[in-house]
Regions:
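Hydrophobic "anchor" residues on beta-strands that sit immediately upstream
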Residues: 6, 60, 163
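Enzymes and membrane/adaptor proteins characterized by extended Gly/Ser/Thr/Asp/Glu-rich
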Residues: 28-48, 52-146, 168
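Phosphate/pyrophosphate-binding betaalpha-module
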Residues: 149-170
Length: 171
């Protein structure tokens, strides 16, 4: 039987267990997403990602590092504001807000890549104010502002060398 796709899974701790190692060796596993429970420091995350790649060199490693309350990498990493703060700035100073969005994307991607993580599921492209779950994770309530700010955030990510993954769907 031929596999149609690969799975992205998570692990429980800050280091690979024997069970994690066995699971990563399975051909169906193509990626791992890290959560806060997997993170102690940049050095520890680098050791973790290196250990994953020792088992499966081409594994994709991801994280949710949006800024604000959705930041799995905290200790030793630069805190970024919720993207809604950039939307607020956009209201009265769009040029600065766009520059800050670019810088935030670059900084986030640079730090994430430096510890061996391939990409962050960011930015959030939802419309601010539609969902309490999303809240200030979204840039703005107006699609034109969302488009402008997210384009700059993604431009920063790309300059750092990271692929972008806008979310959520259906949007």
């Amino acid at each position: 039987m031929q596999a149609v796709g690969q799975l992205m899974l998570d692990i429980e701790g800050t280091a690979l267990s024997l069970a994690d190692e066995a699971l990563l060796r399975q051909p169906e596993v193509g990626g791992v997403i890290l959560f806060g429970r997997n993170v102690e420091s940049p050095e520890q995350v680098r050791e973790l990602t290196d250990s994953m790649r020792a088992i499966k060199p081409n594994i994709l490693i991801a994280v949710d590092q949006e800024g604000g309350r959705v930041a799995r990498l905290r200790a030793g990493f630069s805190p970024l504001p919720a993207m809604g703060k950039l939307g607020e700035k956009f209201e009265h100073d769009p040029i600065t807000a766009l520059d800050l969005a670019y810088c935030a994307g670059y900084l986030m991607a640079s730090e994430v890549l430096a510890v061996g993580i391939d990409f962050s599921f960011a930015p959030v492209l939802d419309i601010n104010g539609v969902s309490r779950v999303i809240g200030d994770r979204a840039f703005h309530a107006h699609p034109i502002a969302i488009t402008a700010l997210s384009a700059e955030f993604m431009r920063g990510m790309k300059l750092a060398g990271m692929a972008t993954t806008g979310k959520h769907f259906p949007g």
